[in-house]
Amino acid sequence: MPLNALALWLLPALQFKQFVLAYETDGLHTKPVAYMAWAQLSAQAESRYVNNAALGLTLKDWQSGERFWITDFCAPYEHASDFAQALATTLPEFCFRSLYHRGAERGMRVHYFRGKHVTPEQAKRWWRDRPILAHNRTELKDEVV
């Protein structure tokens, strides 16, 4: 990530406390092993984000609505599954979406996540009631994770 991207993606997440950072300790040393950030987007901000995520979000966008999008997820392979499960416990009442990070290779995709207190039926209803209004929506493939 270029240094100027920090202002678009890292600093707003820190400013609004919309991130989770996981640590691992061996008794002597503590090291970060996983990070996730999210934005709470309005339908309009979501549409702009899905149409061109590379443009980033404005500060106002980060807390503009109730559509939760994972903007950054970083976890080494050995920690990714455990971290995803921990997030479902840490954020148990929420439904999240994320753009697939290899969209250029496999096509644009949206992944869906839910907290552990959200049933699959509740999650489907949540997402159905908040459809993605992006212009290139027809090019997206949905994957429930």
Which residues fall in each region the model found?
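N-terminal "domain-start" segment
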Residues: 1-21
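Short amphipathic alpha-helix that is part of the acyltransferase structural core
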Residues: 1-7, 133-145
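Acyl-donor binding region in acyl/amide transferases
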Residues: 44-122
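Short acidic/polar alpha-helix capping motifs at helix-coil junctions
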Residues: 121-124, 137
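Conserved beta-hairpin
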Residues: 14-35
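Residue-level detector of conserved, well-ordered beta-strand and adjacent loop positions
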Residues: 23, 39, 71
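Acetyl-CoA-dependent GNAT
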Residues: 37-44
